[in-house]
Amino acid sequence: MPFEIVFEGAKEFAQLIETASRLIDEAAFKVTEEGISMRAMDPSRVVLIDLNLPSSIFSKYEVDGEETIGVNMDHLKKVLKRGKAKDTLILRKGEENFLEISLQGTATRTFRLPLIDVEEIEVELPDLPYTAKVVVLGEVLKEAVKDASLVSDSIKFMAKENEFIMRAEGETQEVEVKLTLEDEGLLDIEVQEETKSAYGVSYLADMVKGIGKADEVTMRFGNEMPMQMEYYIRDEGRLTFLLAPRVEE
């Protein structure tokens, strides 16, 4: 099924793909008249990724019917990284088994990427009984993960009324990032009960890679439960992660 999809701002799209490529090697993108979606798990089955890009965020979206295209994420990332912030990204597929990627700026550069067979995973995002919901600025989360990586391979999230703490403890060092609603970095917090859970720093570092400093990031978690993290792409698109907890001894 042929299609032509245009996205203004190639670099922003590239950042999305780079974030996912840090966690998965290949992906099956479902292209429908409503938009583009992708769901995948990392090889260790610790992180579930769910991407949803409605047709409304694209400047041109000509799709007739439905098709699933499989791509090597590393190859796709490398091509998209050649785009500049003001470049226009054009995705086309004809009858051949290739994805055509054009980057339109001071010149038009076109790449042809072979499509591959990728098994689609039939995994639903579980409806978990989260006891804490926290909304923070992307900059705060990115810096906290960087700080934690200096001292430990895990970071503990703790939420109670009007307070969210991210803490990492190593053998000789520790770091704590504390936020209340009086701080600019904490935008909202809803807590049903005092909640604590730990997560792997390396996975979080990959998950936050594509988040902008001013992006609003929503995290939902429970005691020793998976954490759901999501942020919006141009208000209507959404990238969601589900990260398994690090159960401490």
From Swiss-Prot:
Record's keyword annotation contains Cell membrane:
no
Q: Which family does it belong to?
A: Belongs to the PCNA family.
> Quaternary structure per UniProt?
Homotrimer. The subunits circularize to form a toroid; DNA passes through its center. Replication factor C (RFC) is required to load the toroid on the DNA.
Its biological purpose: Sliding clamp subunit that acts as a moving platform for DNA processing. Responsible for tethering the catalytic subunit of DNA polymerase and other proteins to DNA during high-speed replication.
The record ties this protein, via Pfam families, to: PCNA_C, PCNA_N
Query: By its UniProt entry, which Gene3D superfamilies does this protein fall under?
Result: 3.70.10.10
Entry's HAMAP family?
A: DNApol_clamp_arch
A GO MF label: DNA binding
What's in the keyword line of the UniProt record? DNA replication, DNA-binding
* Keyword DNA-binding applies: yes
**Example of a GO biological process term:** regulation of DNA replication
From the Swiss-Prot or TrEMBL record, give the protein name: DNA polymerase sliding clamp
